[in-house]
Amino acid sequence: MMSIMSASETAIRTVGVPREVKTAEHRVAMTPDGVRELERYGVEVLVETGAGEGASITDAAYVAAGADIVPTAADAWSQDMVVKVKEPKPEEFGFLRDDLTLFTYLHLAAYPAVAEALIAA
């Protein structure tokens, strides 16, 4: 079986999909098809409950694709990799850590506090 590797050559075994907290952000970083693809490689996907609501994707659709639904953002953020649509917001800075692989868009010029939080982690 193939494995998914981070930039530091550490195997990614779990991926978290938190609900986006930015105002008026309705997208979600992973669809059920993405869950199925990662499951093929033995990666466990944990989706925060309601993460897909803004994109009309139900928790049940994620479960049918093989994901586990977790009740809190902390549960989603505690995985090897986290996938998001937008940069972390200040209320998410506490979830950043040295061994986290974060896959997201970053607009650091407009949000220097995000750059500082990422460097500090």
Where are these regions (language model features)?
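Structural/interface elements that position substrates and couple domains in central-metabolism enzymes
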Residues: M2-A120
